[in-house]
């Protein structure tokens, strides 16, 4: 019975080499005979083992010519959709070059010879199993049919020699669109040496089947011990505002973050995991003694951050500690160092440490958000600038530690690690050297008592030095007549708050100082500041004409005026200390108006708080 093959009538690859066997000969004998003929042809040197030419015992043809006819005239006994191929049938997926593959899936030494194939010896056959294309090329590229080699009878229909047969049937994905799901062609291979049933091992060419070929020799294959459901979900993010790294664990659709520097955990997201209501959650977090409120930044970083011990206690009480594993592990960094994502993790941690080192090299530390809040805990500074010679531990993989430990606030866990300034020798490969001091230590809680005291002392010393420099500077330059007019009298001084950096003239952090105002001259007497009081305020113009002509303003004078200058704003009680006359008032309005109107009207910060107070208009109008 001669019928057409279901394999799309010759649109395959032309790699079928079906030898017409004489009638009356069984399929097994025909296959053995064809294999013997091919073997003798290869050994005699007439035909190379992997060439694409014709050999005795194999009917070859072009793609649309003889191959198409061959499917009609060849001896295909099509009974119960089984096609018995009597010749040596090379693998259509492997492109016919099945001789270069050993029985165990690893490529053997290829036999190079004269190949009339347009792509040379075994050009695209290595991609056949991975992508499902026959011969790895387009379906209209005519590749000449090939000759079976001496070893091709062992596995005719193997995908790169890696047929994984389940029982007798082996399936592999044939995703070329010329072989539809309607062509379940069963080809009987004969004299198979490596299959269990060498007499007739069935191989299904179904497009629905799928085969994972383990025949890769270069690409690494990691066999994870844990199933997909049990794999760790630890990710990292760089919190640029805080200059630290955060470890994140996703549980029930909520991302819970843990800081790297002090191990504090986002309590808001933590309680969201257990499905707690907003009122109950906020009530619990409001009563926390040690907390930091973050209101700006990324969504998964906003919320109330609480200490590690308290977060672990809340997680255990609500039964979500297991769901958040490994968030509460002391050495959570060890879960990041998988060979797949090791370079990226190394780069992120190195960037975090470089940023933290830059913050330490910057003069003075700025407090983190929430440090000046109403919490009872000591404020957490953004960068701890006083690293001590604590114990530094290295990770088990030999990565050098760049961190140092500060403080000794021990509540069953170690103190907070802060990175020191790395030396050039230790930062030459910053992508691989990381801060691994959490590996052999417990969790950390922030302690900043010593550093806070030292910073307060430094600020006081700086304030005293600035006061002395200001007085010396103002004594060195005598006051002009205009400054004497704008200067108040040394009369009743109401305020006695200590001077701070906000009103230090010429300080780098003072945006209203003399260094930043071009209109100010000789010591930075800023025109426009006024005295703030809850009493009734009025203008006293006599002070501007009859004020004292001292060479330099005193400290109380600067406290009253805000920056050593005044526009004549006084209290009503000050009228007793200086004469007042209508002539002086008229003279003031005629002479002082242009000078005061041209002065800079700048909002000055108050002495007690950082809120901006009012601005003097300098118009001389009487305010009641």
Swiss-Prot record:
HTH APSES-type domain boundaries: 233-339
Xref: SMART domains: KilA-N (SM01252)
CC terms in the record's Gene Ontology section: nucleus
Start-end of Gly residues biased regions: 615-624
Biased composition (Basic and acidic residues): 571-587
UniProt biased composition (Polar residues): 369-391, 427-451
Domain of life according to the entry: Eukaryota
GO biological process: conidium formation; positive regulation of transcription by RNA polymerase II; sporulation resulting in formation of a cellular spore
Regions of compositional bias (Basic residues) in chain numbering: 70-85
Biased composition (Low complexity): 43-62, 352-362, 392-426
Record flagged with keyword Phosphoprotein: yes
DNA-binding region extent: 267-288
Knockout or disruption consequences: Leads to filamentous growth and abolishes mating and gall induction. In culture, produces abundant thick-walled, highly pigmented cells resembling teliospores which are normally produced only in planta.
Region of interest called Disordered, as start-end residue ranges on this chain: 1-24, 43-99, 352-456, 474-504, 538-624
Post-translational modification: Phosphorylated but is not a target of cAMP signaling.
Localization, UniProt: Nucleus
Annotated keywords: Conidiation, DNA-binding, Nucleus, Phosphoprotein, Sporulation, Transcription, Transcription regulation
Function, as annotated: Transcription factor that regulates asexual reproduction. Binds the StuA-response elements (StRE) with the consensus sequence 5'-(A/T)CGCG(T/A)N(A/C)-3' at the promoters of target genes. Regulates dimorphism, virulence, and the sporulation program. Required for mating, gall induction, and sporogenesis in maize tissue. Regulates expression of the filament-down-regulated gene UM00205 and the teliospore-specific gene ssp1.
Entry similarity comment: Belongs to the EFG1/PHD1/stuA family.
Protein name listed in UniProt: Cell pattern formation-associated protein ust1
Organism whose genome encodes this protein: Mycosarcoma maydis (Corn smut fungus)
Gene: ust1
